[in-house]
From Swiss-Prot:
GO biological process, one term: acetate metabolic process
The protein's name: Succinyl-CoA:acetate/propanoyl-CoA:succinate CoA transferase
Listed SUPFAM superfamilies: NagB/RpiA/CoA transferase-like
Organism: Fasciola hepatica (Liver fluke)
Top-level taxon of the source organism: Eukaryota
Family affiliation: Belongs to the acetyl-CoA hydrolase/transferase family.
Binding-site residues for CoA, renumbered to this chain: G256, I257, G258, A259, I260, I354, G377, K404
Protein purpose: Transferase involved in anaerobic fumarate-respiration in the mitochondria. Catalyzes the transfer of the CoA moiety of acetyl-CoA or propionyl-CoA to succinate, thereby forming acetate and propionate, respectively. Acetate and propionate are the two major metabolic end products in the anaerobic mitochondrial metabolism of F.hepatica. Also displays CoA transferase activities from acetyl-CoA to propionate, acetate and butyrate.
Gene Ontology MF: a single term: propionyl-CoA:succinate CoA-transferase activity
TM spans (from-to): none
Locations listed in the record: Mitochondrion
Transit peptide location: 1-30
Active site: E279
The entry's keywords: Mitochondrion, Transferase, Transit peptide
Length: 478
């Protein structure tokens, strides 16, 4: 289906030169150490092999190989299935897998001795295996994951990716997930691509010329969808507080994953000239673009463009993404650089957490000793907003005051074994349904007081007592 005549043609040198000029002219997205190969550049005389089964696809694979897997909505399910079947049929050992969250079936964690997974951001299909010691988790900032590959801390033998069919110039697109994948394909010895006619074509850093691929495997597959959960009354209230008090017209938005960021977006329909520079976005951004609230007109970097590194959501957002010149999908090392984030006007970073203690320490990746997610870009964007060049950035942690079981999320101490993702020095604004606590520059006694004021009323008295026991002084605003 995809073996078109152009796959066997030789490109004239003017086309090659123009492609290279276009690449270097677009390097506003560049923020990395150069790898041994540049996916934008055609490799003269090289043509990938088309495979029709696992034996043809993975015949070069050996024991102990390091394998990267494209994640998120672009998870290549066909290649995952065929990799598993090939390794098991050949009895290969010690295949090490590296990825951020993947979606869909993930059989590797039940094949001890054959595979070992390392999650650089944990998804639902790996949590149980990590907790049981059958898989691993690496705590790392999303912006620094590319350095694992570029500095050769992890020597990748193979990258499995999901791409669009090549265009008339021979370029494929990584679709909705550029994130850390660009660094992986720059540094992998072999690249195996699932060529997928249902993947949205994206721009920015998303391109790879087919001559950089080792193997192409046709595999039509819809993007993995994540339907947003409707916001609760509490989450809706938090969204309203943030939208009305902390987001100004002309602000540049970063929103994380979840009901609270979605609730904030739903309350911004009357705002004007908002911009988006975010590690990820979902369906909520589409509505604001369609209503004219998001124009990106005042952004200092890539004005007029929605900038992101990956997208999750439903068919609605993938249709919006497809071949849309308004959206640039870029290398996460650049997108999430605090130095880059700080250059945009009024950057607002909206993130959530699992719990926060009375001094401002934030746990986001774990529930006690149980690994739940990862560092992601929370610290990257909180820091970028905090040091914004215009002095108008707002780094926000938004969290309901209690769990579904009425347990307070503002706690005297983080749960035993819980990891600190965002330090108390990073935290400026904390928002619950009861209001806003501003912690920047406040001492521990003042922080405890501010956080207790936005805790659930049922827990404020006990938190005051616990704060006194911990700090040896009563919480006070002065």
């Amino acid at each position: 289906m995809y073996q078109l005549a152009f796959l066997r043609c030789r490109y004239a040198s003017p086309i090659v030169r123009e492609a290279r000029r276009a690449f270097h002219a677009s390097r506003k997205c560049q923020y990395y150490i150069d790898g041994p190969q540049e996916p934008f550049s055609p490799m003269p005389g090289r043509f990938p092999k088309w495979a029709s089964n696992g034996d043809e696809t993975f015949g070069f694979l050996k024991d102990g190989a390091n394998v990267f897997i494209h994640g998120g909505a672009a998870t290549p399910s066909l290649l995952i299935k065929e990799l598993y079947e090939y390794v098991m049929s050949k009895n290969l050992k010690d295949i090490k897998l590296f990825h951020i969250h993947t979606e869909g079936p993930y059989p590797f964690n039940d094949a001890e001795g054959h595979f070992r997974s390392t999650s650089l951001f944990t998804g639902g299909n790996c949590r149980k295996a990590i907790q049981e010691g059958r898989a691993d988790y690496t705590p790392i900032f999303l912006s620094e994951i590319p350095l694992l590959f570029r500095r050769k801390h992890v020597q990748l033998d193979l990258a499995l990716i999901n791409v669009t069919p090549p265009d008339k110039h021979g370029f494929c697109s990584l679709g909705p997930s550029v994130d850390v994948t660009r660094a992986a394909i720059q540094n992998a010895t072999h690249i195996v691509a699932q060529v997928n006619d249902q993947l949205p074509l994206t721009r920015g850093d998303a391109s790879i010329h087919f001559s950089n691929l080792t193997v192409m495997r046709a595999g039509s597959q819809p993007c993995h969808e994540m339907s947003p959960r409707p916001a609760s009354e509490v989450e809706d209230k938090i969204g309203q507080i943030i939208a009305e008090n902390l987001v100004e017209d002309g602000a540049t938005l970063q929103t994380g994953i979840g009901a609270i960021p979605d609730a904030v977006l739903s309350k911004l329909t009357n705002h004007k000239n908002l911009g988006v520079h975010t590690e990820m976005f979902s369906d909520g951004v589409v509505q604001l673009v369609q209503l004219g609230a998001i124009t990106n007109a005042y952004k200092k970097l890539r004005p007029g463009k929605v900038v992101s590194s990956f997208v999750v959501g439903t068919r609605k957002v993938f249709d919006f993404l497809d071949n849309n010149p308004m959206v640039d999908m870029c290398d996460v090392a650049w997108v999430n650089s605090p130095v880059v984030i700080a250059q945009n006007p009024k950057p607002v970073a909206i993130n959530s957490c699992i719990e926060i203690d009375i001094t401002g320490q934030v746990s986001s990746d774990s529930i006690g000793t149980t690994i739940y997610s990862g560092f992601g870009g929370q610290v990257d964007f909180l820091r970028g907003a905090a040091v914004s060049l215009d002095g108008q950035g707002k780094p926000i942690i938004a969290v309901p005051s209690v769990t579904k079981r009425n347990e307070t999320k503002i706690v005297p101490h983080l749960k035993l074994g819980g990891g600190v993702v965002t330090t108390r020095a990073h935290v400026h604004y904390v928002v619950t349904e009861y209001g806003i606590a501003y912690l920047f520059g406040k001492n521990l006694r003042q922080r405890a007081h501010a956080l207790i004021q936005i805790a659930h009323p049922d827990h404020r008295e006990s938190l005051e007592k616990a704060a006194f026991d911990r700090l040896k002084v009563m919480p006070s605003p002065l």
